[in-house]
């Protein structure tokens, strides 16, 4: 079956499946058909024929399904006419837009519109080489049981009004796995959505059987397990989801890596009606993770070096001024030390000179003392001698007085005698 797998928000609806079971005649035999794949195109390129992109996200946080099979078939065949219901649906969904990365410039809508002016070319010359994975190729379909109705376009298989095609084969499971990782309590919701999309795919496969060729008259009733359409599946209308899932991403920020703009219309075949397809998970190699960590480490190291450099540049003037002041203070301290050492030496010399002078004076005083002591001793000796002499004179004076008194009468007698004897001699001598 050809269905675009992706996150859906609608409830599972099995009415189409019941309708298909009731409408399949017994012994009807399908026809051989083929489906030509086109090159990868972005959702913006689908906007011109489809009338705008679908809203990618619903209010409950889940992604919507991609375009319906009718719209995809109309784009592949270059259909320009749109039904009234499609216009209404396109007008209601025209408000949803999405910004894509700048590296998608080569796949911009303007450039694609200039390069692809016409619709799909299904001629033999347009078919790619065999084995080329990135280009369209024809896949034969198996013989399946289809109804015997008239010619119906291969892609004119519209799903029910409450159903929408999913975005890609693995986007639903990828987003559900991411939402389960972020919020583990939503496990039952994920299981319910997986079951709903599997039932939806089964109903789409039963309802969208290929009816583009007349049926044959075989009356063999096909088994109910063979409800998948005999149209193959389109892998590369937006098939870059596989390449995106295998491309290296940042393991630290997986939410920053948007899905490829071409994964909007990815169609893949449902392998079993009862089980969901394997999810597409984003895998990161160890080398990429190590490289990302090394890059971030280098960036952090560069920022640290820049901070150190700026800090050193900021501190350099203050450090230089402090060093200059410290050097000046050391020089002043050394000068003060030298000055006070010189003063101390000078004072010491002065003290030594004063000490020597005092010692000399003391010696002189001691010598003078000795001299004075000697003189004193001499004076004392002389005084004692004088005292002795005085004492001796005091003892001689009375004797002299006595002698005077004894001699004076004698003298007077002698004189009188002489006068008497010689009267003239005595008077002349006395005169």
UniProtKB/Swiss-Prot annotation:
Report the main location listed first in the record.
Answer: cytoplasm
Q: Which biological process annotations from GO are given for this protein?
A: nervous system development
So which domain of life are we looking at? Eukaryota
Signal peptide from the UniProt entry = none
Is Secreted given among the entry's keywords?
A: no
Places the protein is found = Cytoplasmic vesicle; Cell projection, Axon; Cell projection, Dendrite
Region of interest: Disordered = 48-127
Task: Output the InterPro entries linked to this UniProt entry.
Answer: N4BP3 (IPR033571)
Q: Which UniProt keywords apply?
A: Cell projection, Coiled coil, Cytoplasmic vesicle, Developmental protein, Neurogenesis
Task: List the GO terms this entry assigns under cellular component, sorted alphabetically.
Answer: axon; cytoplasmic vesicle; dendrite
Compositionally biased, Basic and acidic residues: which spans? 79-89, 96-127
Chain coiled-coil ranges = 284-390
Q: What does this protein do?
A: Plays a role in axon and dendrite arborization during cranial nerve development. May also be important for neural crest migration and early development of other anterior structures including eye, brain and cranial cartilage.
- Entry's family note: Belongs to the N4BP3 family.
What is the protein named?
NEDD4-binding protein 3 homolog
Q: Which organism is it from?
A: Gallus gallus
The gene that this protein is the product of is N4BP3
